[in-house]
Amino acid sequence: MKRKEMHYCQQVDGNVHKIFLYDDISKYGEWNWETWDYDESETSAAHFQKLLEAVPDGEEIELHINSYGGSVSEGTAIYNLLQESKAHKVGIVDGVCHSIAFTILQGCDERIMGYGTSAIIHNMWASVTGNAKQLREEADKLDVCMESCVQLMMRRATIDEAELRAMMDAETVLTPQKALECGLIDKIGVEQKEEPRTE
């Protein structure tokens, strides 16, 4: 059975398009023995692009997140796709929003963490094999990626860069209140929409 990693639906009244990112971010899906290749991941940037292109300009996207993170390159691409979209993007953390998933949240116009949720920010890491020269080269590449990530987070953060870097060095778990104080989200909790009364 194919695992559904991202779910998309349209809420008819109000033209709100809901996307549920409820898995690790990955370029590749499951291995397909029939095609002898990987299926497209539903949490990849390529799949996300298709979802965003289907949303008319000016309408609203609700991006619900419950993810431990995943591929930095895919997550960064998703962040930029959100930035480019002319829809109004509301990011809502429903559970956990760790690592690159928290970067994706930063691409939304409005960033919300639900009550009892958590986020984690940390330095990038990678599993690498090779000789000493190759390992040093990979470390240099990580430094470049890390610098880009810090600058991305600083676009809206209200703390200074030194404090953000210290928090990432310490692999900090953020409560909604702490994230709000740091300017990394805009709001805690989602307001319940009133249902229209029927006489």
PLM region descriptions:
Residues 1-102, 107-199:
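N-terminal organellar transit peptides
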